[in-house]
């Protein structure tokens, strides 16, 4: 630093300067010397850093990555522990969950030990190592990354967030194996996905926070509130998260502060607390300080300067008009993104806290303390341990008079029995946290227990609730008695019985295949499928040809040709269309039915049910939609074909006839050309009334003309009169459905079905020809054979033609895997298929066609045959020599174990003689004087509340689920939990598994029976008896004094329940005879303090510092409403939400006029609900539910006072903050206050406490005005 700048006093920091220390130096300089000189100092530090960084030339190379030599031995120790845990699991001593948790804990502890070893190795061998200096100075990287580089990567999480119990033993220097690389990619991907998802959540959280707090602006200097809050150091689990000094800096004192011993004045009321003053307060030994807070500020919908304190950016009292609500929202919301970004730095590596453990410093004997109660429990690793119910001391006495004591807090767990001998470094106990009411957040989860071997299920000491399928609280074991289990379809007949002994090659089961209909046999080329053909039909009078467009056609001998709709070797069903053809006209026209009956079908138009005639009156219709002046033809004009109809358009008629124009206003929308003969009759008007009808052949017309064929009499109105027109009619004969071909037995037939595509009297507008009706050939099958598939067969007839054949197929022998599980049978048995018929053989109905036999490839004894109706399978158990073990013994009478009876279970490792141990767990099936025979079995320990998937006696395959183990685990405190927890608190959500809370202060009494009962005895003789649910354990001890609202059991705390408890305590129970307003103030204050602490602990767990005042502003907005119970003489309605300050003023006004007061209760709203219930309906409508909010505001006739920033921005006003604050100054801030009181308040700003006592020069930037 420059000498002239510090000529009066030189300051020297004699320590290693890392990232944290540089931060502290800059903060100290800023507080003591102002921004200008701090900027100069930072410049100097930057130059100094670059100068020496250039000289040193520190870089990272592979040689800098030093792997501790102890790594191999640590990994070997962990492997040995895991092997021992696996042996306990195989013996049925611990459950699958306990094994899993133990393995996870072993690897995590190993990883942490190795991490410490990495640090120690760097310190002792190479303290100037580049990697070590970079990470520990805070320049680049962190300990977790260093650990992954030179230690071990550790445990990873799978895509569901579950920890994989296979850790990555390698580090990045050694390189990962293929398996480790795949597992590693899980965590890395999970990190990226979580970051993407949580970033959106964080942004939405910020939006909600801004919405609730945007109206909070510094509008007053001093609200003169007598209320405040007590600040203490924030602790969790006995660890200080935020010191009292850090919490005090920037706040304003509520009262004068005196030294507790000398009683001298330390600081005055309304004095802001600087760093130096905070030091003085801590030195004085004060543990708690009353300060002003936004939570207790009396300013209406705002905060005053004194209750807010410093603007943390400048280190001095906040100015009027500062939008502190927006700052608070951003301060809480912005680090939400950081809460998720942490995954990138660790790559999804799992981390967790290890419980504080006590190990033996020397060999000796353990002695439990006297007069202390212990409760035997089972740890989460399956070990027996003792839970300490009161604070106590554990004593270890060694040889030569060595003695040491260990302090145990209530809730600690002792791992060694009383008066047991221990060796050095043996684990003695795990210490519970000393923090009051400490509870680890837990969550219920499940894990599938799957069997490792196939065999028979046997329950041992297992009691199951039949209704829910759950194990009772005692637990028990499931044994799987080994054997080969065969899965057979229910179609198979087992030809053996229980107790049969079979040899290799014996038939276990068979299934026979019989023809249900009879017919000709057709074998496939691979002889794997047998098909019986009960019926077939060949169309003799038609052949298939391919036309010019490569479309197959069916051509009949009567020259009718149909378009084929099927292909060769395709499967058909009853009623399917085989071929079809259409009758097409030359132009559009009018259709009329004559003696026809038709029914409507979905797609095929109108199907003919009765034969008759179809009359067709042709006409050519051009849809032009043009102005009348553009039309070149006239109404009633006869025109030849090819005449141009529209000016400048190539629209010409294809047929000659008389023109009829259809007008709509000044437009011609249609030009109709009607072929026919024009009749010139003088009295056309009278004859036109007889028109629009059919004229039969031979009929006289006008007593002059004889009509030779069927005609239609029409007329056209022209400008000169009426023209009569004799139009041609085409008659089509239409037939009802008929069979055109059938087989000999009438099983199959082809029917011809005709359908008309238009309804009677319909006019079809067209220039081109249209498809008038169609003829379809449909395949019909007899009722008894409809469910069988029908296959097509094109039989070559000549070079370019085929004959068409239809075959009804009965498939007799489908693929084998339909009837048994080939994967299971592969190693146990083989399937043999026998076909008992020949190709083209005629078989009768009920004749045997083929059979499948299951042949054993092992020899052994059939012990069980059973059905599994749920899975539609039959299972068969075969015990072979592989499942039997013979143990030789010397003398039956000298056996140590007296429990050796037939049918008993024995576990591996048990001694039956001095030199003989049982090699495998199993069931005793034979005892002789020279040997014992065991059936190899596997025991599985089942915990309480597990859901059982099998029944005793069931047969199971290896890998099948036996039970669903239900257990509780501590919630991981990683990044994934951070943001949801903040959201849960700020949205004031009710927890799923909430703990039991004390309703009043008192002493506890515990009663243990089938359930745990807890009684609270208060000093005023109010007793409350609470019963805990099964599986829920108390967190308090006998005769422990507890406060109201304290948690008594495990689980999450419900904020709403705390609020209700304290309100009942302060007001409804009338303990202190408080007024309604005071009771609400006090009960809300408890909630506010709880929420501030909880939010801070989440952010502090991730190393993020947020000032209390920001959180307090948000929580003030959440707790500033009350719910009306009775409106009294006010206009308020029950359940209406209103601001607490507003109802207080209303009640105060009514009390002076002796009116009936409104009654109300406190309520806690989440940030979303608070935003929607704000006074400004413009702000609320712009947030969510716009229509509902605006409609409600309109109905209630609300007026928006435009006090916040958001509503002013929306309507285009100047915002009431910063420079725009003065525009609102007159009415909003100094209302009902005189000038004299303003001067008194502002004079405090110039008190000595606010002046800079450490600086000799005025700061050139901050104090230039």
From Swiss-Prot:
One GO term (biological process): DNA-templated transcription
Residues that coordinate or bind Zn(2+): 223, 297, 304, 307
Pfam family, one: RNA_pol_Rpb1_3
InterPro entries for this protein: DNA-dir_RpoC2_beta_pp, DNA-dir_RpoC_beta_prime, RNA_pol_Rpb1_3, RNA_pol_Rpb1_3_sf, RNA_pol_Rpb1_4, RNA_pol_Rpb1_5, Rpb1_funnel_sf
Protein name: DNA-directed RNA polymerase subunit beta''
Necessary cofactors: Zn(2+)
Quaternary structure note: In plastids the minimal PEP RNA polymerase catalytic core is composed of four subunits: alpha, beta, beta', and beta''. When a (nuclear-encoded) sigma factor is associated with the core the holoenzyme is formed, which can initiate transcription.
GO molecular function, one term: metal ion binding
Family, per entry: Belongs to the RNA polymerase beta' chain family. RpoC2 subfamily.
UniProt GO cellular component terms: cyanelle; DNA-directed RNA polymerase complex; mitochondrion
Cofactor annotation remark: Binds 1 Zn(2+) ion per subunit.
Subcellular location: Plastid, Cyanelle
Gene3D superfamilies xref list: 1.10.132.30, 1.10.150.390, 1.10.1790.20, 2.40.50.100, RNA polymerase Rpb1, domain 3 (1.10.274.100)
Top EC class of this enzyme: transferase
This protein's UniProt keywords: Cyanelle, DNA-directed RNA polymerase, Metal-binding, Nucleotidyltransferase, Plastid, Transcription, Transferase, Zinc
């Amino acid at each position: 630093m420059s000498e002239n700048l510090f000529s009066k006093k030189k300051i020297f920091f004699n320590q290693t300067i890392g990232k944290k220390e540089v931060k502290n130096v800059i903060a100290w300089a800023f507080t003591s010397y102002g921004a200008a000189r701090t900027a100069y100092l930072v410049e100097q530090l930057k130059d100094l850093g670059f100068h020496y960084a250039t000289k040193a030339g520190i870089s990272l190379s592979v040689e800098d990555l030093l792997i501790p030599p102890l790594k191999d031995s640590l990994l070997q120790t962990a492997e040995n522990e895991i092997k021992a845990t696996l042996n306990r699991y195989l013996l049925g001593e611990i459950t699958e969950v306990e094994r899993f948790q133990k393995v996870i804990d072993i690897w995590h502890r190993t990883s942490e030990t190795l991490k410490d070893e990495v640090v120690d190795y760097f310190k002792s061998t190479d303290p100037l190592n580049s990697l070590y200096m970079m990470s520990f100075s805070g320049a680049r990287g962190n300990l977790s990354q260093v650990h992954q580089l030179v230690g071990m990567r550790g445990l990873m999480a799978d895509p569901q967030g579950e920890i994989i119990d296979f850790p990555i033993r390698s580090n990045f220097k050694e390189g990962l194996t293929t398996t480790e690389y795949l597992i590693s990619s899980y965590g890395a991907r999970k990190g990226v996905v979580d970051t993407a998802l949580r970033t959106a959540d964080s942004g939405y959280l910020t939006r909600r926070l801004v919405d609730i707090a945007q109206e909070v602006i510094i509008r007053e200097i001093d609200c003169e509130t007598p209320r405040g809050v007590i600040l203490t150091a924030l602790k969790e689990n006995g660890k200080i998260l935020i010191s009292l000094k850090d919490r005090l800096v920037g706040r304003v004192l509520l009262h004068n502060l005196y030294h507790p011993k000398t009683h001298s004045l330390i600081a005055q009321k309304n004095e802001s607390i600087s760093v130096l003053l905070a030091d003085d307060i801590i030195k004085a030994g004060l543990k708690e300080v009353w300060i002003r807070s936004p939570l207790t500020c009396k300013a209406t919908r705002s905060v005053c300067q004194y209750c807010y304190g410093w603007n943390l950016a400048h280190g001095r009292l906040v100015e009027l008009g500062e939008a502190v609500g927006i700052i608070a929202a951003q301060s809480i919301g912005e680090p939400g993104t950081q809460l998720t970004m942490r995954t990138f730095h660790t790559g999804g590596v799992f981390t967790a806290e290890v419980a504080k453990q006590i190990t033996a410093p020397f060999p000796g004997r353990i002695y439990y303390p006297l007069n202390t109660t212990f409760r035997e429990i089972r740890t989460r690793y399956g070990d027996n341990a003792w839970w300490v119910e009161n604070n106590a001391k554990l004593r270890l006495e060694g040889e030569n008079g060595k003695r040491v004591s260990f302090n145990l807090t209530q809730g600690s767990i002792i791992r060694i029995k009383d008066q047991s001998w221990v060796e050095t470094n043996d684990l003695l106990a795990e210490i519970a946290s000393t923090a009051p009411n400490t509870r680890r957040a837990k969550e219920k989860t499940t894990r599938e227990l799957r069997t490792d071997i196939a065999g028979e299920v046997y329950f041992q000491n297992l009691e199951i609730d039949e209704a829910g399928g759950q194990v009772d609280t005692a637990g028990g074991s499931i044994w799987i008695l080994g054997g080969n289990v065969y899965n057979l379809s229910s179609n198979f007949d087992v030809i053996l019985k229980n107790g049969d002994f079979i040899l290799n090659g014996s038939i276990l089961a068979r299934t026979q295949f019989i023809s249900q209909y009879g017919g000709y046999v057709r074998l496939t080329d691979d002889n794997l499928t047998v098909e019986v053909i009960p019926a077939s039909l060949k169309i003799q009078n038609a052949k298939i040809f391919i036309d010019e467009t490569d479309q197959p056609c069916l051509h009949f001998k009567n020259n009718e040709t149909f378009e084929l709709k099927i292909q060769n070797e395709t499967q058909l069903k009853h009623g399917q269309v085989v071929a079809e053809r259409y009758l097409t006209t030359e132009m559009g026209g009018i259709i009329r039915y004559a003696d026809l009956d038709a029914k409507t079908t979905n797609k095929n138009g109108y199907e003919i049910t009765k034969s008759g005639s179809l009359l067709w009156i042709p006409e050519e219709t051009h849809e032009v939609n043009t102005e009348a002046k553009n039309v070149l033809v006239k109404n009633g004009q006869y025109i030849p074909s090819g005449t141009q109809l529209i000016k400048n358009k190539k629209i010409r008629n294809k047929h000659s006839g008389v023109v009829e124009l259809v007008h709509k206003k000044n437009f011609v929308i249609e030009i109709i050309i009607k072929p026919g003969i024009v009749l010139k009759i003088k009295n056309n008007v009278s004859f036109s009334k007889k028109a629009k009808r059919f004229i039969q052949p031979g009929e006289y017309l006008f007593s002059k003309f004889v009509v030779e064929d069927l005609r239609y009499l029409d007329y056209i109105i022209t400008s000169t009169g009426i023209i009569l027109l004799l139009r041609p009619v085409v008659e089509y004969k239409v037939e009802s459905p008929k069979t055109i071909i059938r087989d000999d037995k009438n099983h199959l037939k082809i029917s011809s079905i005709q359908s008309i595509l238009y309804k009677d009297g319909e006019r079809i507008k067209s220039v081109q020809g249209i498809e008038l009706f169609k003829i379809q050939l449909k395949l019909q099958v007899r009722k008894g054979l409809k469910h069988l598939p029908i296959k097509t067969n094109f039989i070559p007839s000549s070079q370019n033609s085929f004959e068409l054949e239809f075959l009804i197929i009965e498939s007799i022998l489908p693929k084998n895997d339909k009837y048994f599980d080939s994967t299971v049978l592969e190693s146990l048995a083989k399937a043999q298929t026998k076909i008992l018929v020949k190709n083209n053989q005629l078989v009768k109905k009920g004749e045997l066609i083929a059979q499948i036999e299951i042949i054993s490839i092992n020899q052994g004894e059939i012990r069980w045959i059973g059905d599994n109706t749920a899975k539609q399978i039959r299972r068969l158990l075969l015990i072979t020599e592989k499942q039997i073990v013979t143990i030789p013994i010397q003398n039956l009478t000298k056996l140590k174990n007296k429990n050796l009876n037939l049918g008993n279970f024995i576990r591996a490792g048990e001694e039956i003689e001095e030199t003989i141990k049982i090699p495998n767990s199993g069931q005793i099936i034979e005892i002789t004087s020279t040997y014992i025979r065991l059936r190899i079995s596997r025991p599985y320990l089942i915990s309480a509340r597990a859901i059982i998937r099998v029944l005793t006696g069931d047969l199971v395959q290896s890998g099948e689920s036996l039970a669903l183990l239900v257990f509780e685990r501590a919630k991981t405190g990683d990044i994934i939990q951070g943001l949801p927890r903040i959201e849960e608190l700020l949205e004031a959500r009710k927890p799923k598994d909430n703990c039991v809370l004390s309703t009043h202060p008192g002493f506890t009494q515990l009663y243990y029976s089938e359930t745990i009962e807890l009684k609270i005895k208060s000093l005023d003789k109010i007793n409350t008896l609470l019963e805990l649910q099964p599986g829920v354990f108390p967190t308090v001890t006998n005769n422990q004094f507890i406060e109201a609202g304290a948690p008594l059991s495990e689980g999450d705390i419900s904020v709403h329940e705390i609020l209700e408890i304290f309100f009942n305590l302060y007001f409804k129970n009338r303990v202190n005879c408080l007024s309604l307003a005071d009771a609400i103030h006090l009960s809300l204050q408890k909630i506010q303090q709880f929420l501030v602490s909880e939010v801070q602990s989440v952010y502090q767990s991730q190393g993020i510092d947020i000032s209390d005042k920001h959180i307090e502003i948000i929580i003030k907005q959440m707790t500033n409403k009350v719910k009306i119970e009775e409106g009294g003489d006010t206009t308020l309605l029950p359940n209406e939400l209103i601001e607490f300050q507003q109802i207080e003023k209303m009640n105060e006004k009514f009390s002076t006029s002796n009116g009936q007061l409104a009654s109300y209760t406190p309520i806690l709203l989440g940030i979303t609900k608070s935003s929607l219930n704000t006074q400004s309906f413009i702000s609320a409508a712009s947030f969510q539910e716009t229509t509902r909010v605006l409609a409600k505001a309109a109905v209630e006739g609300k007026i928006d006072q435009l006090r916040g920033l958001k509503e002013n921005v929306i309507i285009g006003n100047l915002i009431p903050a910063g420079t725009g604050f003065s525009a609102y100054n007159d009415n909003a801030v100094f209302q009902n206050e005189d000038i004299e009181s303003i001067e008194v308040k502002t004079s405090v700003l110039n008190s000595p406490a606010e002046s800079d006592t450490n600086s000799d020069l005025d700061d050139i930037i901050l104090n230039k005005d």
